[in-house]
């Protein structure tokens, strides 16, 4: 089974009206850092071009959401 991208999984959860924890990347003096906080229906995930690379960001997001939803079993 193909692994869905975290953004798609998050969007599906939002569409179902689920309230869950999300990751927002905020700019700071060093470029960006991960902020782990609550997001609600309709929230967006922000990324910074200065933050490592897209693959790392996606893996990090996926790991955090797996911790929340109990992983892909």
Tell where the protein language model's regions lie, with residue ranges.
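A short, exposed loop/beta-hairpin motif centered on an aromatic-Gly-Thr core
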Residues: 42-56
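Residue-level detector of alpha-helical secondary structure
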Residues: 11, 58-69
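Residues marking helix boundaries in flexible regions
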Residues: 24-25, 46, 62, 69-70
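Short N-terminal "domain-start" leader segments
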Residues: 1-36
């Amino acid at each position: 089974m193909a692994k869905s991208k975290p953004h798609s999984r998050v969007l599906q959860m939002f569409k179902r009206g689920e309230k869950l924890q999300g990751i927002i990347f905020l700019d700071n003096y060093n470029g960006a850092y991960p902020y782990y906080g609550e997001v609600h229906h309709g929230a967006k995930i922000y990324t910074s071009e200065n933050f490592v690379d897209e693959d790392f960001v996606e893996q990090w997001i996926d790991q955090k959401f797996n911790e929340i939803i109990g992983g892909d079993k």
